[in-house]
Regions:
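Single conserved hydrophobic/aromatic residue that forms the stacking wall/gate
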Residues: 1-8, 12, 369, 373-379
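Compositionally biased, intrinsically disordered low-complexity regions enriched in proline and serine
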Residues: 2-6, 34-35, 111, 176, ...
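Noncatalytic, helix-rich "gating/capping" subdomain that lines the substrate-entry/channel surface
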Residues: 9-223, 227
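Pocket-edge structural micro-motifs
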Residues: 21-23, 330, 375
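A signal for specific C-terminal beta-sheet/loop modules enriched in small/flexible residues
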Residues: 33-45, 340-351, 378
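Short amphipathic alpha-helical segments with coiled-coil-like heptad repeat character
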Residues: 51-59, 256-258, 336, 378-379
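Intrinsically disordered, low-complexity linker/terminal regions across diverse proteins
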Residues: 66, 72, 101-104, 118, ...
Length: 379
């Protein structure tokens, strides 16, 4: 559980690895659930859900207190519109500026406890400054019992999916059915696969690629991507409404697109992850520690341009503005999107649309503002 989120990634305006601080601390999807009248039934259901979970676990947790505190926290959140604004959420601050912003929240103690070299806090990106300013006011008027109650709830809620059947089912009744409208929980084996996917996804990916994505398919898709980038280049050149200066910038950015096809060139090493067949929670803790150590190790060097943020067996694709890359996992490079034996028209109409969509993200209302023109060949 996190009152706020902290992660490191490439700075969209430079090649540096930098810490990002983001809002958090809520049990419901976003701040609107705490203020809009239409969500009053959801808020009531949350209180009831917390009470039931606490009863099953044999704990004393006040759902009303959790909701009251989270309503205050939500009041400092950016709404969804602000939170996707690339300019509003790019706030680079020095450590002194960040400490001043947080006020009553002692960020120095956090830095010490994080076990991260303090030099990485010399400059950070704060996505939602008003949240951290508000958090400082909450900590200036600290209600210990309310925060202990909140922390106990989030500890239970975060682990609920791995505990007893009653807790698993009650957790799903609220988050799966009440919030999401899903009537029935997935079979246990499917949930187990999801856990494995989220924990050692690239290890599974190796086997998936071996079975379903031969080198010949990768070569075909690489040619498709190259052709579609060429078509995009031609389209930009032929635009009559775009100024010459803007065209030059757009073409420069397009020329530095880095396509990633199918699977990573360098697989993640899981050899230090020790798991057991008899203790699920011990495995969850081991996975959490392994993941944290993996993230901390990133700070020892430059941005890892070989890293993927989806596994090969994921049916999806993405554009990464920080590295100006378009990424297509092997699982989306299957029928009906792509078939190595199909004619070109079929593949351009299928995976071609996906490739064009991801290309377009580099020039959409937010990612066009990413001025860093990264590629795997230049810096």
């Amino acid at each position: 559980y996190e009152i706020y989120q902290c992660d490191w990634s490439s700075d969209v305006c430079s090649s540096d690895l930098i810490l990002y601080f983001m809002q958090g601390g809520l049990s419901l999807p976003d701040e609107a659930y705490y203020r809009d009248d239409q969500y009053q039934p959801i808020r009531t259901a949350l209180i009831e859900h917390i009470s039931k979970m606490a009863q099953i676990a044999g704990l004393e947790i006040s759902g009303t207190s959790v909701l009251e505190l989270e309503t205050k926290i939500a009041g400092f959140h950016f709404d969804q519109v602000k939170d996707r604004d690339a300019m509003l959420t790019y706030n680079k601050l020095s450590r002194a500026e960040f400490e001043a912003l947080c006020g009553g929240f002692d960020i120095s103690t956090y830095i010490t406890a994080s076990q991260v070299d303090p030099k990485f806090f010399n400059e950070v990106i704060v996505r939602e400054p008003q949240f951290f300013e508000g958090l400082g006011t909450l900590f200036s008027n600290f209600d210990l019992s309310a925060w202990k109650n909140w922390a106990l709830w989030h500890l239970l809620s975060g682990a609920a999916g791995y505990l007893t059947e009653d807790l698993v089912n009650q957790n799903f009744a609220f988050y799966g059915t009440t919030l999401s409208g899903t009537p029935k929980i997935r079979e246990r084996w499917k949930r187990a696969i999801s856990l494995v996917e989220g924990s050692i996804g690239e290890e599974v990916g190796k086997e998936y690629v071996k079975r379903h994505f031969p080198p010949t398919s990768k070569a075909q898709v690489q040619q498709l991507v190259s052709n579609l980038i060429a078509a995009y280049r031609q389209s930009i050149n032929e635009l009559t409404w775009m100024s010459p200066d803007t065209k030059t910038k757009a073409l420069t950015k397009l020329s530095k697109f880095t396509p990633k096809i199918g699977y990573p060139d360098k697989w993640r090493d899981y050899s230090k992850l020790q798991l057991t067949e008899t203790d699920l929670m011990a495995n969850i803790k081991a996975i959490a520690k392994f993941s944290r150590d993996y993230e901390l190790n990133k700070l020892a060097g430059p941005v890892d341009r070989d890293e993927w943020h989806m596994t090969p067996q994921t049916v999806n694709a993405y554009y990464n503005p920080g590295l100006n890359e378009i990424v297509f996992p092997a699982a989306i490079l299957q029928a009906p999107f792509f078939d190595p034996d199909a004619d070109d028209a079929s593949n351009y109409g299928g995976i071609g649309a996906v490739i064009g969509h991801e290309n377009g993200h580099g020039f959409d209302d937010q990612d066009r503002k990413s001025t860093r023109l990264n590629s795997s060949h230049t810096d």
